[in-house]
Amino acid sequence: ADMAVNAALKALDNAGINSEDIDLIIAATSTPDYLFPNCSSIIQKNTGAINAVCFDISAACSGFIMALSAAKAYIEAGMYKKVLIVCSEKMSGITDWKDRSTCILFGDGAGACVVESSEQEGVKSVDLHNEGMLGEVLTAKRNENIVMNGQEVFKFAVKKVPETINTLLKKENTDAEDIKYFILHQANVRIIESVAKRLGIDMNRFPVNLSRYGNTSSASIPILLDELNRENKLQNEDLLVFAGFGAGLNWGSIILHQIP
């Protein structure tokens, strides 16, 4: 949980928010240090977020999408005002280093963000899906390593991700040209390139950082979002699309409006 705590502290600092003002912590991880206490409780203990309710989400590579969707729902319901989302994965701990079909793909990492209520709508439409019948395509049993049918995961991703993005754009009555960046889960470059091609959108609007970190599962989208922010590539009023996909099999997308 060290990476999770570090990411959480940096997110709070960047947002200029006191940890005691956080009233909900959602941790997304498939590689917790403990069965219990959960990762979010460890984050609470080490950040001083003493007023927060804590729970974890296990949604593998779609973890950030699911966590952000949950935060949106809780805030809109009036239950919580400031939510800390932390995605942290130690993929090296469940990787078979003799299996080159997986060991060269994954990396360790953590990313975090603070979501709070606002008069303006930041997190807009959400589109989520799950197909448990395909669960055996990507598995990691207790105390065992990742087993993946890469070909089936590829076929699933390049079909379902464009579908969910198109559904999202229709919900918002928004054209793809209005989107600044499509920030996808960083699974592999071939998947991202194929999604861009199927959508008919230039690849330069699909940022990629795989060469630096590999596939960090739920952490990949918040890590990439932080990089774009640090590089001053995000501006107020930008529209962004996040899309995640992975073990479950599950997938989904969210449209975000960058507000001042």
For the regions a protein language model found, what residue spans apply to each?
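Acidic-glycine-rich active-site phosphate/pyrophosphate-binding loop
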Residues: 34-48, 84-91, 136, 140, ...
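Anion-binding (especially nucleotide phosphate/pyrophosphate-binding) glycine-rich loop
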Residues: 14, 18-50
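Claisen-condensing/thiolase-fold acyl-transfer catalytic domains that form or cleave C-C bonds
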Residues: 5-8, 12, 32, 45, ...
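Condensing-enzyme catalytic core mediating Claisen C-C bond formation in acyl metabolism
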Residues: 91, 98-159, 163-166, 245, ...
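Short acidic, glycine/serine/threonine-rich loops at helix termini
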Residues: 36-38, 95-98, 251-255
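Short beta-strand segments
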Residues: 28, 58, 83-89, 115-116, ...
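Conserved active-site "lid/cap" helical segment
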Residues: 1-23, 141-180, 191-200, 224, ...
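Short coil/turn connectors at secondary-structure junctions
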Residues: 19-23, 49-53, 77-83, 99-101, ...
